[in-house]
């Protein structure tokens, strides 16, 4: 049984077929990269799966349960979380409190964060564990707004991970950061996936990152899947090379 499966998923925006009968599977424990040129349909597909868009038709099954009609919050509770291309943090709160707030929300705790943080030892302990996993333990008392861009990206992923999903979608986690920060972010995410804690689907444009970290790569083009396979097979695919890498086969 696949962890996630979509069945003939469709979404149009006027004349644009952004998701054209997509049958997509994600297997438990894999690191999957979703690639394609701008406008290929990658973010639309993830938005459909995470309930930020409604499909025109088709079904979404998670752990063999039909979740097509569930809301964003219901899908989070079911075990699906995501981070966005544009970092979504509370800059006025500390790094620690950003993660703690995600844990409070996950557990349905609604009191003021200052009260909860002062009185909930379990949440404080779990927050420290998440920060340590993401290399942010020493930054806990800083405000999120004080972090460097790469650290902000890491914190954004850590906040999504603190929801303890079974499936985590990451939308361009390495955009607008240095090469060293890219490695730090992806090494951390890869380590969490390899530990068995979560399955990850990453939208990524940096093909060096994609080939280095992925177990499987799926390429979208004009709302449909053009290629699906392990890195070596995708690297050797002439259609992929032509569209993504600008490489044409010899005449």
Regions found by a protein language model. Give the residues of each.
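Glycine-rich phosphate-binding loops of nucleotide-dependent enzymes
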Residues: 2-251
């Amino acid at each position: 049984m696949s962890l996630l499966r979509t069945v003939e998923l469709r979404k149009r925006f006027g004349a644009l077929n952004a998701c054209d009968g997509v049958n997509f599977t994600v297997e438990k424990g894999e690191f999957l990269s979703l690639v394609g040129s701008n406008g290929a349909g990658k973010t639309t597909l993830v938005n459909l799966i995470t309930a930020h868009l409604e499909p025109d038709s088709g079904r979404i099954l998670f752990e063999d349960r039909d979740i097509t009609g569930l809301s964003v919050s219901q899908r989070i509770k079911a075990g699906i979380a995501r981070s966005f291309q544009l970092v979504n943090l509370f800059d006025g709160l500390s790094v620690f409190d950003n993660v703690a707030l995600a844990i409070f929300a996950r557990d349905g705790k609604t009191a003021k964060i200052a009260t909860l943080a002062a009185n909930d030892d379990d949440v404080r302990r779990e927050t420290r564990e998440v920060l340590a996993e993401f290399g942010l333990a020493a930054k806990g008392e800083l405000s999120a707004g004080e972090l460097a861009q790469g650290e902000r990206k890491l914190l954004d992923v850590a906040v999504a991970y603190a929801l303890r999903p079974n499936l985590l979608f990451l939308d361009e986690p390495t955009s607008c950061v240095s090469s060293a920060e890219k490695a730090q972010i992806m090494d951390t995410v890869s380590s969490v996936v390899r530990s068995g804690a979560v399955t990850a689907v990453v939208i990524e444009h940096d093909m060096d990152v994609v080939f280095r970290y992925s177990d499987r790569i799926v390429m979208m083009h004009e709302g449909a899947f053009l290629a699906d396979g392990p890195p070596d097979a995708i690297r050797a695919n002439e259609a992929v090379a032509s569209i993504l890498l600008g490489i044409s086969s010899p005449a």
